[in-house]
Structure formats: structure tokens, C-alpha cells
Amino acid sequence: MMGWREGDAAVVSTRLVSSVQAVMASSAGCIIASSCRDVMEDRHWLTDAYIMFATPYFAYDIYAMFLCHWHKQRVKGHEEEEGEEELGGVRSLGAAVVGYLRREVLMVLHHVFVVAFCFPASLLWRQGKGDYFQGVLFLAELSTPSVCLGKVLIQYKKHHTLLHKVNGVVLLLTFFSCRVLLFPYLYYAYSRYASIPLYSVPLVAPWQCNLGAALLWPLQLYWFALICRGALRLFARRSNSPP
């Protein structure tokens, strides 16, 4: 692929697939949310269809992230030599799996939770209610292309370019608006629909909704804090660099 090494091609291809899926999810979310005037009763065929499409993607993405980790470790020189015994290769693969789970444990747990819990909750337990809210949830993927582009730029040591800085600003804005504010907005939208105080929504919302928000929202806050910390470090390095 364009003369790239296998590892580089695999990593960039994985980021590209993630970005394409994110654009599709965001587009589906916009269509669904804009089509539902009644946030609870209105339905759109794209809701269940995209849930069926996106769920296998999250399962695939666990493997794709491992593939990226595996190639990064090989580049760093942690792979076994080509001529060594098969047992050594097995040990190398096992070490890569353990290292991957340690490094990406939160992301893996996030994806497993989406597949094991959010899929049945979205497709079965909600019983056709709340397509609007499902569409808004799809909009969380709007920040993913910026995440992927940032990782590719860092991979190719382009983190000092203007493109990386602009992408960082876009990432901060999209992640904050589409992920950090996501769950508060969902509760706010339901409070307006039901004409009840915002603090009363958790008391009447289905337990599946409360559990999903309780587990997923803290992850978004944590990842946003990491993004802000990275942005501050970049700004500090730029301020301390000689003119």
C-alpha cells in the first residue's frame, strides 16, 4: 500500500475504517434525531438497522485495536525473530495480548459493554421507544475522525504541524459537545418531554438507561481529561520552546 510497511498500512487502514464508521454513525444520528418530533414515540427505520450494523463493528474494533498494538510493538523491536521456534512466537503473541489489555483495558471494557449490554438494551429492551435518543447517541461518534487523525499525525511525527493543532481544537470541541454533554442532554431532553424536573429523570428512567449512563459517562469525562492534558502539554512545550 503506497510503499508503506505492513504495520503502517495496518494502522492507517484501521484508523480510516474507524473514521468512515464514525461518519456513517453521525450521519445516521442526524437523520434519526431530525426526523423524530416526538422523542419517545416517533420511529425511524434507520435506528434498528444501524444498531445491527454497528454492533459487529465494535466487536471487530477490539481486534483492530489489538492489531495496531501488535504492529507498534513489532516496530519497537519487541517481536520475536523470524527464525526462532514456534513456541517463542506463541509467547510473543501472548505477551502482546497481555500488554494490549493492560494498555487499552478501558477501551476494551467500553466496547464489550456496548456489545453485551447496549445492543440488547437498544434493540430489544426499549421496545421501539426513544428512537430520537438513540439517534443522539449515534452522534457521539462525531469526535472519532479527529481522534483517528490525531493518532496518525503523531505516528508520522507530524504533531508540530498546523494541521495537528487545528485537529486538536476540533477534537476538543466535538468530544466535549458530543460526548461530555451527551448524557446530561439526554436527561434534559426527557425532562422537557415529560415536563418533570431534571433531577427527577433518573427516578423514572428505565434502569438500563441509568446503568448505561453511570458506566459510560465517567469514561467520557476521563478521556476528555486526558485530551485536555495532552493539549496543555503541547501548549506548554510551544511556550517554552526558543523563538
Name each region found by the language model.
Residues 145-154:
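Juxtamembrane membrane-interface segments at transmembrane alpha-helix termini
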Residues 1-139, 153-243:
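Membrane-helix and juxtamembrane interface regions of eukaryotic multi-pass membrane proteins
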